[in-house]
Amino acid sequence: MRKGASNLNVSTAQRAAPMVSEAPIVMDCKLDKIFYGNFMAVRDSHVPIRKNEITGFIGPSGCGKSTVLRSLNRMNDLVKGFRFEGHVHFLGQDVYGKGVDPVVVRRYIGMVFQQPNPFSMSIFDNVAFGLRLNRYKGDLGDRVKHALQGAALWDEVKDKLKVSGLSLSGGQQQRLCIARAIATEPEVLLLDEPCSALDPIATRRVEELMVELKKDYTIALVTHNMQQAIRVADTTAFFSVDISQGTRTGYLVEMGPTAQIFQNPREQLTSDYISGKFS
């Protein structure tokens, strides 16, 4: 895992040109405008997501991090008044293109939410839920086991698969939700502050799991914890808020390798944020 940078605020003269990752872009996300009704939540944000990397989204509350994340697999379609201008290119196709089924999009771009949300059913059925929904024809037991192993949970629950997922601890519930997400073998995992409701020990387990999972998946992570971004993210995108005429619109300030963002940010606004001058 990444170690925290010792110098989080450097002068413009010290800033070096960022080293751009050579990993291929899995998702090219051009978010021109995102609306909820007449309210513009996000503007002018271009966010490339690279294969087998963790891309962290950081920024103050209300800057649109979660709105951006939920736009990547069309979860925001479920919100009344949502409107999207731009494109999200994934596997050679715009997920907002005409005729694209958002349910199919979410099959390939899975999501784990801030609060662990296991269903009121057994551990096994929680993991098998998406497989059954997608009419999986293979060995369900093997696939569930594989997903639980991938989420580093199998050894803890293998003897109680018929027990309710709600009986697990908070950290175990979040790993169960991750197992449920990876059971359908998505290409991309979207994690919306997955550790915010967890204690430090459970947080460490999930962070270790994220680093392990990126070997097989591409991950986008929203986090309020800058130290978490330093520890796990390969690339970090910093968002801020434009406040005008009583409204708050989020936008991307800069994006680059995590070490560069935290040690040598190009923008003064980024430097001010990571040094604690505003939050």
Swiss-Prot record:
InterPro entries the record matches: AAA+_ATPase, ABC_transporter-like_ATP-bd, ABC_transporter-like_CS, P-loop_NTPase, PstB-like
Record SUPFAM superfamilies: P-loop containing nucleoside triphosphate hydrolases
Gene3D superfamilies tied to this protein: P-loop containing nucleotide triphosphate hydrolases
Disulfide bonds: none
Function statement: Part of the ABC transporter complex PstSACB involved in phosphate import. Responsible for energy coupling to the transport system.
Similarity comment: Belongs to the ABC transporter superfamily. Phosphate importer (TC 3.A.1.7) family.
PANTHER family given in the database record: ABC TRANSPORTER I FAMILY MEMBER 17 (PTHR43423:SF1)
Subunit (UniProt): The complex is composed of two ATP-binding proteins (PstB), two transmembrane proteins (PstC and PstA) and a solute-binding protein (PstS).
Protein name: Phosphate import ATP-binding protein PstB 1
